[in-house]
Design a protein with these regions (language model features):
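N-terminal transmembrane-helix/juxtamembrane module of multi-pass inner/ER membrane proteins
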Residues: 1-39, 74-102, 184-191
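Membrane-helix interface segments
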Residues: 23, 54-59, 126-132
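Alpha-helical transmembrane segments
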Residues: 34-37, 60, 64, 116, ...
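Hydrophobic, aromatic-rich transmembrane alpha-helices
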Residues: 40-51, 115-123
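Interfacial segments of alpha-helical transmembrane regions
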Residues: 42-73
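Helix-loop junctions at the membrane-solvent interface of multi-pass transporters
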Residues: 51, 81, 173-176
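Alpha-helical transmembrane segments of multipass membrane proteins
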Residues: 66, 70-75, 162-170
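Membrane-embedded catalytic cores of phosphoryl/pyrophosphoryl-handling enzymes
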Residues: 95-191
Length: 191
């Protein structure tokens, strides 16, 4: 266990301090700030609801259920149960903190869990967007370490939670779709 903690802290300090540049000190807080994603998220919802037909509306429904579950379980159940303290609370005097400290608990990262869930669900329905979504998910995860509010294993744990819940939600969707198609109901079918 001590070896994992050492690896986690070493990676944290490498990303948070060794990789620190003026450009990244401006870019990473921008990437990590949820408010900066409001317009793209509203645009995504609009596109899925209005412009993408039935497939888009189904994607949006699966996405809302998935992220709702992922966010709740990660923030309300796993974080308090694990009880890992953020680097911004634990070692504040040793880090390059570029945003506010955030809540007390760090594992798993909700940013990482939610963006991974979004990536998996949208990639399932629209595979052509997978590369850009993976890149954005990775950037958001790295930004959380860079700004000083998460350890690398918090991000990896968040990615795992998001991935598991996304595939669980997709699996339930596929089961529902197959059941409805067997019953002759075509509301689940899209092109």
């Amino acid at each position: 266990m001590k070896t994992l903690e050492y690896i986690d802290q070493s990676l944290f300090f490498f990303i948070n301090q060794t990789c620190s540049t003026k450009l990244l000190n401006t870019l990473m807080p921008f990437i990590t700030n949820q408010k900066n994603w409001a317009i793209p998220i509203v645009a995504l919802i609009f596109i899925l609801m209005i412009k993408s037909g039935k497939r888009g509306r189904i994607t949006l429904g699966v996405l809302i259920i998935c992220i709702g579950m992922t966010d709740f379980i990660s923030a309300q159940l796993i974080k308090p149960w694990i009880g890992r303290i953020r680097p911004s609370h634990e070692i504040l005097d040793q880090i390059n903190l570029l945003v506010n400290k955030g809540g007390k608990w760090s594992f798993p990262s909700n940013h990482a869990a939610n963006t991974m869930a979004l990536t998996v669900v949208i990639s399932y329905f629209y595979e052509k967007y997978k590369p850009i979504l993976i890149l954005l998910t990775f950037l958001i995860g790295i930004s959380r370490i860079y700004v000083g509010v998460h350890y690398p294993f918090d991000i990896i744990g968040g990615f795992a939670v998001g991935y598991i819940f996304a595939w669980g939600t997709i699996t339930l969707w596929v089961m529902l779709k197959m059941r409805e198609l067997k019953r002759g109901r075509d509301w689940v079918w899209y092109n």
